[in-house]
Amino acid sequence: TGTNSSIGQVAIGSSALTALTNGTENTAVGYQALSAEASDGTVANTALGFKAGLSINGAKESTMVGAWSCDALTSGTKNTAFGSSTLSTATTALNNTALGYNTMANVKAAVAVDGCVAIGYEALLGNSSNTTGINNTIAIGYHALNVLTTGAGNSAVGSWAGSATTTGGYNTAFGYKAMANAVTAASNIVIGYEA
């Protein structure tokens, strides 16, 4: 770990926590885990995996488990990311839970991503374009809301639920492939198999 005022750090792995100079209570396990030059606001983070939390600078109370998990995250608090490449391109994220391979992996935002829950393979995946305004969205299931780029307050539960929706807010889709063909949708309630 760094040499200034780092306190209570645990680092296991090549280059883990190497540049941290003023953080406290961080745990990094894996090659380059939590290895960015970090400010004294970097507190109580846990990063386990290859390049997990690689760019963290000032983040607090986040848990990242899996290769490349939160590797572009520079700031934010209280994120939980489990799985390879979870939340891997978001730079500012707050209060998010991402569980599963590539879950929320391509969410890039000009503003902070806040209050999202994504569970399942590539749930709420996003794309490499500028993703904005998806706050307070829930995506549970294989590919649920996986191309959403703009639209807050959505809830999709079920494999492929809302899987074609790129734009739209305040939708509720429940069931296998529910709302799977709607590219742009707002304020809908869709329940049932392929509804």
Regions found by a protein language model. Give the residues of each.
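Glycine- and small/polar-enriched repetitive beta-structure motifs of secreted/surface proteins
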Residues: 1-195
